[in-house]
Amino acid sequence: MPSDTTVPDEYADAALFLGMNSEDEGVRRACKAFFVDRLDGRIVMSLEQVGRCDDIIWGFSRELQDAYYPFMDNLHTVMDIRRLGYEEADVLHATGTELPRSLPVHERLLLGMVRDRKGLLHTASPRLAATTGFAVRAVTGADGPEARFPEPLEDLYQQSLALRVPAEAL
């Protein structure tokens, strides 16, 4: 009997994406390493998680937004990020009894999507990282030299660091 060698789609949430600009240096470096390591691969983000990134960034001054967005825009262009909307089955999983009611609705919707589509969620969210029984992997510390994007993306990333996201926003 052949074994299933299908690699699950890797999902990223807003906490992981914005974690690249975290005030916490360990989180920042780990999240950046995640994206650098997958720059030539593919990840999936729900449309809502992409929108959550914008919602948080829009809370900063126009000057900080202008420093941040060139990096984000370029990363979304050069990296294969599949942005997907929810399907009915995702919502049904999110509203079912198997997902913890202690999680906010947006996180239950994301877990429902990942579970329904048999993916693997990578996150910097302490709440999601503490959730057991689901395909969730918390980003871990990055040892050694800091990972670097190829130029000109690295330069744009360094400029984006004018904006730092507080840990509680992740």
Give the residues covered by each predicted segment.
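Short His-Asn-centered micro-motif
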Residues: 12, 46-47, 122-125
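Active-site neighborhoods of divalent-metal-dependent phosphate/nucleic-acid chemistry enzymes
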Residues: 80-132, 163-170
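Short amphipathic alpha-helical segments and helix-helix/interface helices
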Residues: 31-36, 69-72, 109-111, 129
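Active-site regions of enzymes building and remodeling cell-envelope glycoconjugates
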Residues: 133-144
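A generic structural signal for short hydrophobic patches within well-formed alpha-helices
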Residues: 17, 50, 128-129
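Short, well-structured N-terminal submotif of metal-dependent ribonuclease cores
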Residues: 1-45, 57-66, 147-170
